[in-house]
């Protein structure tokens, strides 16, 4: 059995022990020796003495197997090294040892680990193994958007196109987010189903009326389908809500250009360029506030996963 599959199997055992109600392993939270060792580990880590920090974290876990910060420290080292099997194993232990209030965030980290294991399997051209890891990621955190996207991609790569589409459609019913809808739009476009493309974004806009990125995506679909009147109406409505959006003015300029209204097109393009021309709806990291031109699975600045959300595309 490969290490990644062994890790996948062990999650059930780890979660079963947690659910069974067994007492948590000793954490050393009030032990003077544990506190002093943790202080030294932190100092070593901050000073760049990584091997010393690892040794101290391992000592803590030998004496106090439920020491949460030692588990986090070794997990972070594993992530930095790209050792996702080790990271997942440590995260399973951390999920067991963590207090109830911390379990949601620890579940998110477990999802990250399985997601990265799945990506490794895809890179090895083994989509079936990747599917198992992505499903494990979603069992850990059902709201983990990168896992939903990647699960569908892996199913497609494995030849199960129908299940891939069902995976994305089920997720879109409750979480109509732009990257997810883009996957479905691609499918419907390939199948020459423009009505489904329009219905997809209309339903999403009705479900989340405050998400301006969805409204812009509906306008873009109208534009690409040559429904210029509908596209113009959609972007003019958006202009009222976000008058300084370069996305809105870029599309209005393109609409006027298609209509042959050269002067109006020039005016809109000029506004778009002044504001920062872009046809893609920008995103912002919920953790550190960094903006990105499009959605990404991981923030380029703080390196957190699943934190980018649509933002108002203004200066």
What are these regions (language model features)?
Residues 24-63, 79-83, 113-125, 129:
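Alpha-helical segment of the N-proximal tetratricopeptide repeat
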Residues 25-28, 97-108:
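Flexible helix-coil transition and linker loops at the boundaries of alpha-helical arrays
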Residues 33, 67, 110, 144, ...:
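Residue-level recognition of tetratricopeptide repeat
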Residues 65, 99, 142, 175-176, ...:
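Short coil turns that delineate tetratricopeptide repeat
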Residues 70, 104-106, 113, 147, ...:
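TPR alpha-solenoid repeat register
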